Curated annotation (Swiss-Prot):
It comes from Streptomyces coelicolor (strain ATCC BAA-471 / A3(2) / M145). The gene is cobB. Its cofactor is Mg(2+). The record marks 466 as: Increases nucleophilicity of active site Cys. InterPro entries: CbiA/CobB_synth (IPR004484), Class_I_gatase-like (IPR029062), CobQ/CobB/MinD/ParA_Nub-bd_dom (IPR002586), GATase_3 (IPR011698), P-loop_NTPase (IPR027417). Comprises of two domains. The C-terminal domain contains the binding site for glutamine and catalyzes the hydrolysis of this substrate to glutamate and ammonia. The N-terminal domain is anticipated to bind ATP and hydrogenobyrinate and catalyzes the ultimate synthesis of the diamide product. The ammonia produced via the glutaminase domain is probably translocated to the adjacent domain via a molecular tunnel, where it reacts with an activated intermediate. This is Hydrogenobyrinate a,c-diamide synthase. Residues 254-272 have a biased composition (Pro residues).
Length: 486
């Protein structure tokens, strides 16, 4: 099979389930691996904001795992972002989130797998945990098929099937609903995918064990599923009417904020540093070097952030805070995303050279964007261990899980946004920072409750809030312009 002539018509499937824990991650990742092993170029996608599953998807396919989140980015960007990721691919596999019809709390279908399937005009394959039922599976499947006629459930994969007789009973029941059974996975020891306080352990921390786990998922799906039928179902989709997202075009189309009004007698503003203007070539012909944290402690990042920074004129280089003793030479801006600094607090604290390098850059006024784990790293201490000391705040682990979507507005002008900029984000952590906000907070939260959060100091913007810059491309442009002027 060759790549689709029209990217908008790429064959595609959505792997969903009635609820979490049904096996959709195993099936989705295994299907990606099985199709890749057959020589297909597979585009991997994940519904929702989760950073960890896309790492397994990337391992299965050899391509960047990408998120499709209608809450963070808006429904209008789901199709374009999907097509951007699927360029040049033979087929796309989209792993759902939670149950098929579960979305943002109190928002109807918003951010649900069902909504994304409809936006992509993609058939859904329902993964059903059949371990404790037989004929009742027909009622369950019938309910999911009939709940929303706009959602096309094209087949079922039965998981945790006990025996040949159990399989026969299940097939007979599902046949009565008129939905084909596209796979049967027998009850077996689960593939080794260890979890901890925030879900699966990321790929970056598991090394060869993650490779083995993905291979096992692929073998299980290849043995138990009708791959030809699944590919045929994926090919039954039509073209999408939207165009693929492009980072450069997004920057051009994103409206710039107004120029500041100069004070009397002040020199006119330099047009090269107009906030929000599509990036002109810098006078010295150089791109601005932005260092981005990576490695086992900082694995949470959306690929579009790097693409937007590059389109805005940055040279993005990665570094590992666990191993590198200083920031990359010539660093002019710093991005520290999410991850698990609490797991690696001792190692991060022991790397005094890098902590000093980060602090020096931050205190120089250079732009620093830190989300969640990045916020913790910039604090004075984490669980009593010294961190970078950029923020006069202390972080500690907590038993309480903070989780959910947030509506936010920028409270203070910063390296990322002008005050009043509205964005949507999500929080996902088991830590506490005290105080929770600085004299100049980063965000004012409007939902689910009103509060201020985060820190804006010098060029630093640090917050628990994870955002998706594709929803507000001017964030990347403003950050790179700040690199140019700091």
């Amino acid at each position: 099979m060759t790549s689709s002539d029209s990217g908008s018509a790429v064959p595609r499937l959505v792997i969903a389930a009635p609820s979490s824990g049904s096996g959709k991650t195993t099936v989705a990742t295994g299907l990606m691996a099985a199709l890749t092993a057959r020589g297909l170029a597979v585009s991997p996608h994940k519904v929702g904001p989760d950073y960890i599953d896309p790492g397994y998807h990337a391992l299965a396919t050899g391509r960047v795992g990408r998120n499709l989140d209608a809450y963070l980015c808006g429904p209008e960007l789901v199709g374009p972002l999907f097509l951007h990721g699927a360029r040049g691919c033979d087929i796309a596999v989209v792993e759902g989130v939670m149950g098929l019809y579960d979305g943002a709390a109190g928002e109807g279908e918003l951010a649900s797998t069902a909504q994304v399937a409809k936006l992509l005009r993609a058939p859904v394959v329902l993964v059903v945990d059949a371990s404790s039922q037989s004929r009742s599976v027909a009622a369950l499947v019938h309910g999911f098929v009939s709940w929303d006629p706009e959602v096309r459930i094209g087949g079922v994969i039965l998981n945790k099937v006990a025996s040949d007789r159990h399989e026969a009973l299940l097939r007979e029941a599902v046949d009565s609903v008129g939905v084909p059974v596209l796979g049967v996975l027998r009850r077996a020891a689960p593939v080794e995918t260890p979890s901890r306080h925030l879900g699966l352990v990321p790929v970056a921390e598991r090394g060869s064990d993650a490779v083995d786990a993905v291979a096992a998922m692929g073998a299980r799906v290849a043995d138990g599923c009708d791959l030809e039928a699944l590919v045929g179902l994926a090919r039954s989709t039509g073209a999408l009417s939207c165009a693929a997202w492009d980072a450069g075009e997004a920057l051009v189309s994103s409206p710039p904020p107004p120029l500041p009004v100069p004070s009397p007698g002040a020199a006119p503003p330099d047009p090269l540093v107009r906030p929000g203007r599509p990036r002109p070539q810098a006078p010295d012909g150089l791109r601005r070097r932005v260092a981005m944290a990576s490695g086992a402690a900082f694995t949470f990042s959306y690929a579009e952030h790097t693409e937007l920074l590059a389109a805005a004129g940055a040279e993005v280089v990665t570094f590992d805070p666990l191993r590198d003793e200083e920031l990359p030479e010539g660093t002019q801006g710093l991005v520290i995303g999410g991850g698990f600094p609490e797991v690696y607090a001792s190692e991060l604290s022991a790397n005094e050279g890098l902590r000093k390098s980060v602090a020096e850059l931050a205190f120089s006024g250079a732009p620093v964007a830190a989300e969640c784990a990045g916020l913790l790293y910039l604090c004075r201490e984490l669980d009593g261990l010294p961190m970078c000391g950029v923020l006069d705040a202390a972080a500690r682990m907590s038993k309480r899980l903070t989780l959910g979507y947030r509506d936010a507005v920028a409270v203070s002008d910063s390296a990322l946004a002008v005050a009043g900029t509205r964005m949507r984000g999500h929080e996902f952590h088991r830590t506490v920072v005290e105080p929770g906000a600085g004299a100049a907070p980063a965000w004012g939260m409007r939902a689910p409750e009103r509060r201020v959060e985060g820190f804006v100091e010098r060029g630093v913007h640090a917050s628990y809030l994870h955002t998706h810059w594709a929803a507000e491309p001017g964030v990347a442009r403003r950050f790179v312009e700040r690199c140019r002027t700091s």
